[in-house]
From Swiss-Prot:
Keywords: Actin-binding, ATP-binding, Calmodulin-binding, Cell junction, Coiled coil, Cytoplasm, Cytoskeleton, Endocytosis, Endoplasmic reticulum, Endosome, Motor protein, Myosin, Nucleotide-binding, Phosphoprotein, Repeat. Disulfide bonds: none annotated. Residues 165-837 form the Myosin motor domain. One of its GO terms (biological process) is endocytosis. This is Myosin-1. Residues 839-868, 862-891, 888-917, 911-940 form the IQ domain. PROSITE patterns: IQ (PS50096), MYOSIN_MOTOR (PS51456), SH3_LIKE (PS51844). It comes from Arabidopsis thaliana (Mouse-ear cress). The gene is VIII-1. CDD domains: MYSc_Myo8 (cd01383). The modification Phosphoserine is found at S14. Belongs to the TRAFAC class myosin-kinesin ATPase superfamily. Myosin family. Plant myosin class VIII subfamily. Homodimer.
Length: 1166
């Protein structure tokens, strides 16, 4: 395929046209490179005024810049004066107005510029310089800092013009070589444009900082195709659109070395898929699995603060409408050794530090947690924190995520208990018990805490860590363990618990995200697997990780190189083969049977006496002839990977490959009371019963042995590759710009080494010179055949396809027709897709307009029919309502007539009865007036004529009328009198109630007075009794004294005794009067009380009596007042008499008694 080359391009034929990543020239000459660049640039250079997404920059490397006809998605070249005197008079060129001028302006622009080339400095970095002169095999180069050096012309690498600085697709570079790619990525990296396309591959440079490229605004822009710059969102959008359009499962394969940003890139892709396919709520659960998996599967290493120590494949399932219906997570090769051993400056898994920092006081007390530096497993690396990371906050995030994926609170506490048990296991120490260095665990806090957390007996735990039961035939031998053996047993138990816990968590997450009956077969798989690793000391983990990367690189090569070129050849496409670095030899070194690395490793693992040294010797013996293997001294050997040489040390290879946990430890876990250890034991028993699939070795091999770690991992990789092989892959290559994890630092050597590993240059070359878009004749004709103007019903698919291409003026060099497919260069199918979409959109608008017209017509017809139907229905309804009203009116009229007739009959009967009464009264009166003279009545009172009629005199009739009027007047008077009497009766009833109230109050007052009189009387009785006793005592004393004073005078004694007797007689009479007064008081009180009670009963109607209770009550009150006055007078008289009797006595004490008594009496008197 020939193409015209511009004069300027012809002048550059003497320079090396293109370079591979190793810097050597290749057979792909300048014509192909420049020609391709011209065509691609033609589709991207805008017309004048068409700059968009521009940024301002100053090119310090070149030293000058001018207005450029190139816009290039994110580049804006600002005019600046030249710093040197070369070509100082160059004028700026205006932007072209047509396609021809556009290319002519580009050529003129290039001719005006001094040629620029890349030169490699002694430190390995590339520097941009200007070619001042060329003589023979040497050239004079001017460097940016002003130095002028002379170099060999063959070492120079052509540089792209500055108008191509920062292009977003490496396919647009005119010169495709290492320094140009490095410079372009560096330019974009400094502008925070971290994504660059390399053909079908997205190159993502880790910025080590937050960049404003994410969020809902960007998601919406990529969903609507309003932003076409390279991005993870664009890759995810392409995947989901192709899945729906082609009904083929998709995969997004993210690769790169540790610290390149693979985990974050995977999360960004999941974020976009969740935004586009969300709505059911399951997408939120899928996103929340990331904190859980990172906490339990990621750790800080020397190269990465958040390094994934396991591989994962997240398969997101979609419904037919493109909505997420579920997901499934598959994990690979968790680095269990990190649980018990960490290198200096690294950390174990994040969850341990998060638990120690963020556990609540109640949880800390329950798990007996302490700070992280007190656990030996965590303290051996002397690294407990990560700059800028709050472990306590991350722990709460993990707990929230566990809630979202439906892990119960009880299960969460069990998970944390297992983590604490692992930490405390590391603190279990041993003591020597005999001369043979046998040990047993120290019975301290660590041992008891472990037993408590996993729910086992402490004695069983002690036996498991210090002894081992071995079955020999039918006998059981108990072997005591030495210190190294006991430590290995302890660490193996800790690693197994953590590994099983990680698998259990993944299983719980998968249950929460299960698709179930909603599965449709459509899915997008996101692979985030550990990157290529090479350390100062590489062990079994790096061996497996790098093997996985070799397998992924082979998958990458197969899809982008092998299958691509094989398809071109099979379909008869005119194609120039592109060479690429194939890693099949290295992959065969690992997988070849029976003399591959994995086979020899498994074979040595089956030998009881096999050691790490015997393994190294065996590898050197059988693999020394392989070009990818080199045996070193001792336990070292080197493998030449696609990414570079890695030296491994076989120390620990056999132990880690066997991954044996003794049956005693499994039995211990199965005997625990907690559910999780029991589940772990069941899982390990199931795994231990699985034999090796197929005879890996010769007779006497490992058919009955447990699957080794390497074999299991190889099987998982084969299944993974098979699953990815059934999908359409989308590749993202993550690049780590520096090893210090600092933003803004760009290390050329490190980036270049990763680009070489990724094969980016080969990908761009094959994509630029190839046909990335292909479609079968049948599918192409079905998809775009309706765009043809002429009828194509009777034509074959190939003729239809060719007719479509001619109709839309697709240039012949932009496509090729194969035996079964059409092959298009980049961007060509997009033109047809745009036309198809516009046509379909127009068809849809026409259809919608026509369907709208049909719908409106139908609606009008329906409205008319509905109106008619409504009128009929409403008429029928009104007629029924009218008939009902007539029936109700007729029924009402009938009821009214019946009621009125009933009332009339009742009135008539009343009038008739009244008439009879009046007639009887009048007749009686007439009879009484006649004094029984009936004859007069018969003869004179009335006469009968011949016809039998009664004749009444006029005088009699007038008399009767007068009497009737009089009777009526009397009746009215009686009625008025009756009304007056009723009013008076009502007044009497009111007065009666008032009188009854007054009577009750008077009765209460009277009762109080009676009680007062009774109390006064009782006091008087008591006082008189006291005075009587006092007088008697005084009389006896006086008599004795008189006797003693003058015992000889009888006359005196006689007078004394007579005086006492005379005084005692009136006192006795006074007591009798008082007694009668008391009896009278009691009698009267009884009488008055009975009378009052009787009147109350009469008043209340309980007793019938022919008397007026009010008048009788007033009379009774008058009688009580009269008696009271009389009784009071008699009491006063009695007092005076008693006072006179008391005055005749000379004793002062009696007077005091009397005054006291009468004072009480007066105070209590009413």
């Amino acid at each position: 395929m020939s193409q015209k080359v511009t004069p300027f391009m012809q002048s550059l034929k003497s320079l090396p046209a293109d370079y591979r990543f190793d810097g050597s020239p290749v057979s792909d000459r300048l014509e192909n490179s420049s020609g391709a660049s011209v065509r691609l640039t033609n589709s991207n250079v805008p017309r004048k005024g068409g700059l968009r997404n521009g940024v301002s920059r100053t090119d310090t490397a070149a030293g000058d810049s001018e207005d450029s006809p190139y816009s290039g998605h994110g580049v804006f070249v600002e005019e600046q004066s030249l710093t040197d005197d070369v070509d100082s008079g160059a004028a700026t060129m205006p932007l072209p107005q047509s396609d021809e001028r556009r290319w002519s302006d580009t050529s003129a622009y290039a001719r005006k510029k001094i040629l620029q080339s890349w030169i490699q400095l002694p430190n390995g970095n590339w520097e941009l310089g200007k070619i001042l002169s060329t003589s023979g095999e040497e050239s004079v180069i001017s460097l940016p800092e002003g130095k002028v050096i002379k170099v060999i012309s063959e070492t120079l690498v052509p540089a792209n013009p500055d108008i191509l600085d920062g292009v977003d697709d490496l396919m647009q570079l005119s010169y495709l070589n290492e320094p140009s790619v490095l410079y372009n990525l560096n330019y974009r990296y400094n502008q925070d444009m971290i994504y660059t396309k390399a053909g079908p591959v997205l190159v993502a440079v880790n910025p080590f900082k937050e960049v404003p490229l994410y969020g809902n605004r960007y998601i919406e822009a990529y969903r609507k195709k309003s932003n076409e710059s390279p991005h993870v969102y664009a890759i995810a959008d392409t995947a989901i659109r192709e899945m729906i359009r082609d009904e083929v499962n998709q995969s997004i394969i993210i690769s790169g070395e540790s610290g390149a940003g693979k985990t974050e890139t995977a999360k960004i892709a999941m974020q976009y898929l969740a935004a586009l396919g969300g709505g059911s709520g399951i997408e939120y659960e899928i996103l929340k699995t990331n904190p859980i998996l990172e906490a339990f599967g990621n750790a800080k290493t020397l190269r990465n603060d958040n390094s994934s120590r396991f591989g994962k494949l997240i398969e997101i399932h979609f419904s037919e409408s493109g909505k997420i219906s579920g997901a499934q997570i598959q994990t690979f090769l968790l680095e269990k050794s990190r649980v018990v051993q960490c290198a200096e400056g690294e950390r174990s898994y994040h969850i341990f530090y998060q638990l120690c920092a963020g556990a609540s006081p109640a949880l800390r007390e329950k798990l007996n947690l302490t700070s992280a530096h007190e656990y030996k497993y965590l303290g051996q690396s002397n690294c407990y924190s990560i700059n800028g990371v709050d472990d306590a906050e991350r722990f709460h995030t993990v707990k929230e995520a566990l809630d979202i994926v439906h892990v119960s609170k009880e299960d969460q506490e069990s998970v944390f208990a297992m983590l604490a048990a692992v930490l405390w296991l590391g603190n279990v120490s041993f003591t020597v018990i005999d001369n043979e260095n046998h040990v047993e665990p120290v019975a301290d806090e660590s041992l008891s805490t472990v037993a408590k957390l996993i729910g086992c007996n402490i004695n069983e735990l002690t036996l498991t860590l210090s002894k081992r039961n071995m079955r020999v035939r039918n006998d059981t031998i108990v072997q005591k363990l030495t210190l190294p053996q006991a430590i290995d047993a302890r660490d193996a138990l800790a690693k197994s618990i953590y590994s099983c816990l990680f698998d259990w968590l993944v299983e719980q997450i998968n249950k929460s995200l299960a698709v179930g009956k909603r599965r449709t077969g459509r899915s997008i798989s996101i692979l985030d697997i550990y990157g290529f690793e090479s350390f100062d000391k590489n062990s079994f983990e790096q061996f497996c990780i790098n093997y996985a990367n070799e397998r992924l690189q082979q998958h990458f090569n197969r899809h982008l190189f092998k299958l691509e070129q094989e398809e071109y050849i099979q379909d008869g496409i005119d194609w120039t083969r592109v060479d690429f670095e194939d890693n099949q030899n290295c992959l065969s070194l690992f997988e070849k049977k029976p003399l591959g690395l994995l086979s020899l490793l498994d074979e040595e693992s089956t030998f009881p006496n096999g050691t790490d040294l015997t393994l190294a010797n065996k590898l050197k013996q059988h693999l020394q002839s392989n070009s990818c293997f080199r045996g070193d001294k001792g336990k070292l050997f080197t493998v030449v990977h696609y990414a570079g040489e890695v030296t491994y040390e076989t120390t620990g290879f056999l132990e880690k490959n066997r991954d044996l946990l003794h049956s005693d430890s499994i039995q211990l876990l199965s005997s625990c009371s907690c559910l999780l250890p029991q589940a772990f034991a069941s899982s390990m028993l199931i795994q231990s019963e699985k034999p090796v699939v197929g005879p890996l070795y010769k007779a006497g091999g490992a058919d009955s042995q447990r699957l080794s770690v390497a074999t299991k991992f190889k099987s998982q990789l084969f299944q993974l590759m098979q699953r990815l092989g059934n999908t359409t892959p989308h590749f993202i290559r993550c690049i780590k710009p520096n090893n210090i994890q600092s933003p803004g630092v760009y290390e050329q050597g490190l980036v270049l080494q990763q680009l070489r590993c990724c094969g980016v240059l080969e990908v761009v070359r094959i994509s630029r010179s190839g046909f990335p878009t292909r479609m079968s004749h049948q599918k192409f004709s079905r998809r775009y055949g309706f765009l043809l103007v002429e009828n194509i019903a009777d034509r074959d698919p190939l003729s239809v396809s060719v007719a479509i291409l001619h109709q839309f003026n697709i240039l012949p060099e932009m496509y090729q027709v194969g035996y079964t497919k059409l092959f298009f260069r980049t961007g060509q199918i997009g033109v047809l897709e745009d036309t198809r979409n516009r046509t379909l959109h127009g068809i849809l608008r026409v259809q919608s307009s026509f369907r709208g017209y049909q719908a409106r017509c139908l609606l009008k017809e329906l409205k008319r029919g509905i109106s008619i139907l409504q009128s009929f229905v409403r008429g029928e309804k009104i007629r029924k309502e009218f008939a009902e009203l007539r029936r109700r009116h007729k029924a009402a009229a009938t009821i009214q007539s019946q009621v009125k007739s009933k009332i009339a009959r009742i009135q008539y009967k009343g009038i008739a009865d009244a008439s009879v009464v009046i007639q009887s009264a009048i007749r009686g009166w007439l009879v009484r007036r006649c004094s029984g003279d009936i004859g007069w009545l018969k003869s004179g009172g009335a006469k009968t004529n011949e016809l039998g009629e009664v004749l009444v005199k006029a005088s009699v009739l007038s008399e009767l009328q007068r009497r009737v009027l009089k009777a009526e007047a009397a009746l009215r008077e009686k009625e008025e009198e009756n009304d007056i009497l009723q009013q008076r009766l009502q007044q009497y009833e009111n007065r009666w109630s008032e009188y009854e109230t007054k009577m009750k109050s008077m009765e209460e007052i009277w009762q109080k007075q009676m009680r007062s009189l009774q109390s006064s009387l009782s006091i008087a009785k008591k006082s008189l009794a006291v005075e009587d006793s006092a007088r008697n005592s005084d009389a006896s004393v006086n008599a004795s004294d008189a006797t003693d004073w003058d015992s000889s005078s009888n006359q005196f004694r006689s007078q004394t005794s007579n005086g006492v007797g005379s005084r005692l007689q009136p006192m006795s009479a006074g007591l009798s009067v008082i007694g009668r007064l008391a009896e009278e008081f009691e009698q009267r009180a009884q009488v008055f009380g009975d009378d009052a009670k009787f009147l109350v009963e009469v008043k209340s109607g309980q007793v019938e009596a022919n008397l007026d209770p009010d008048r009788e009550l007033r009379r009774l009150k008058q009688m009580f007042e009269t008696w009271k006055k009389d009784y009071g007078g008699r009491l006063r008289e009695t007092k005076l008499i008693l006072s006179k009797l008391g005055s005749e006595e000379s004793s002062g004490s009696m007077e005091k008694v009397k005054r006291k008594w009468w004072g009480r009496r007066n105070s209590t008197r009413y």
